[in-house]
Amino acid sequence: DPKGKTDAEVMRFCQSFMTELQKYIGPSLDVPAGDIGVGGREIGYLYGQYKRLNQFDAGVLTGKPLGFGGSLIRPEATGYGLVYYTEEMLKANGNSFAGKKVVISGSGNVAQYALQKATELGATVISVSDSNGYVIDENGIDFDLLTDVKEKRRARLTEYAAEKPTATYYEGSVWTYAGNYDIALPCATPVSYTHLTLPTKRIV
C-alpha cells in the first residue's frame, strides 16, 4: 500500500520486488502491466531495476513513461475511451455530453481523464471521490487542481476541497449524493452503486 510512503520508500520496494520478479518475466514469458496503485512512477522504478539487472529491457513491462519507450496517451486511454464510448451511445439516442451534469466516482487515472474529456465535450463534472469520501462542486471539478492534489502531492480530496471555495467534501460514497445529475461514470473500484442506491438516476 503506497499511501503515506515517500518516493524513496516506494522506489526501494519496487526495486526489491523486481529483483525477485525478474527471474519469471520477459518478452517470451510474461509481461506485467500497471494496475490500481501501480502507475507510471512505479512502472518506471520496476523497469529501471529490470534493466539494471539484465542489461536488456525490450518488451518486459507495459505502461512505461514515454521517456522509457511507453505509448503516447496510454495514461489517458481508459478515461478517454469511457467518455468516447458513452458519447457514441448518447449520439445513437439523439443526445450528447453537451450541457449535461456528470457524477464521477474515483479520482485516479481513469477518473481524471474521464473528467477532462467529458468537460471538453461540454459537460459539467460535479464530483470525484476517494476511499474516504467525495467532493461536490456544482461549478465543475477543476482538472488542473485535481491532478496537482492527486498526482503531485498524492494527497486526499479534503485538500482539494480546502483549496476550492465552491467545493464541499462529504464522507461516504458518492453514490449516496441526492442532488440532480444526468450521467454517472463509475471510475473507481469497488463499484458501489446499485439500483437501490440510485433509484432515480440515469446510469450510462
Name what the model sees in each region.
Residues 161-193:
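Accessory "access/gating" subregions that flank catalytic or transport cores
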Residues 76, 80-169:
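Glycine-rich phosphate/diphosphate-binding loop of Rossmann-like nucleotide-binding domains
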Residues 19, 28-31, 58-59, 65, ...:
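Structural motif
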Residues 1-97:
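Glycine/serine-rich phosphate-binding loop and adjoining beta1-alpha1 elements at the start
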Residues 194-200:
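Conserved small/polar residues in nucleotide/adenosyl-binding loops
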Residues 38, 89, 109-110, 133, ...:
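Short, glycine-/Ser/Thr-/acidic-enriched flexible segments
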Residues 3, 7, 36, 72-76, ...:
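Hydrophobic alpha-helical scaffolding
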